[in-house]
């Protein structure tokens, strides 16, 4: 039986495709691979490379100003795994990325911009830091620890 081999891409509907392209290409360092167009020549999507097997698609002409809040149904965030969190976060901020941190006010969680990067230990045992793209999509940067809950679960699954 064929198996799923990975997550191919994340697709985002964005309000200003050039602003989002600048963020993901210049700040996050995802090179543009190609553009697809409708028959009338208008832009359908921009395809960016995260890794050789993982991509980001930017679809233009989003109608709302920002992504839905973290309590809304739908995508909460997407996570990018990294090797060295301090160095990577510092490089992203140096290229114009805005560091963010989770706060709670009146029982409502929100990811808000902060002056300097915040690196925390997640409940799963991994180190994490957060930022938002120009449309408010939440991005987690995660350095996976050798004994994190995910790695423990992988070892258990392999032993079955």
State where each predicted segment sits.
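Vicinal oxygen chelate
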Residues: 14-18, 71-135, 146, 157
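Acidic/histidine-enriched, glycine/proline-rich intrinsically disordered or flexible terminal extensions
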Residues: 142-160
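Core segments of cupin and vicinal oxygen chelate
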Residues: 2, 13-56, 94
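Short, charged/polar surface micro-motifs in flexible loops or helix N-caps
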Residues: 51-55, 63, 83-87
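Residues that flank catalytic or metal-binding motifs in active/ligand-binding sites
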Residues: 6, 44, 52-54, 74-76, ...
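Conserved catalytic-core motifs of GNAT/GCN5-like acyltransferases
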Residues: 31-39, 102-104, 126, 143-148
């Amino acid at each position: 039986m064929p198996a799923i081999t990975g997550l191919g891409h994340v697709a985002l509907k964005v309000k200003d495709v050039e602003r989002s392209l600048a963020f993901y290409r210049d700040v996050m360092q995802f090179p543009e691979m190609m553009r697809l167009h409708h028959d009338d020549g208008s832009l359908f999507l921009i395809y960016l490379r995260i890794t050789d097997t993982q991509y980001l698609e930017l679809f233009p002409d989003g109608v709302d100003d920002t992504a839905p809040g973290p309590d809304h149904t739908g995508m909460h965030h997407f996570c990018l795994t990294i090797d060295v969190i301090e160095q990577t976060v510092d490089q992203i901020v140096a290229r114009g990325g805005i560091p963010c941190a989770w706060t709670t006010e009146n029982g409502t969680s929100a990811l808000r911009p902060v002056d300097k990067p915040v690196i925390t230990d997640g409940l799963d045992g991994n180190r994490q830091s957060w930022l938002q793209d120009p449309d408010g999509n939440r991005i987690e940067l995660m350095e996976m620890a050798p004994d994190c809950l995910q790695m423990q679960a992988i070892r258990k699954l392999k032993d079955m």
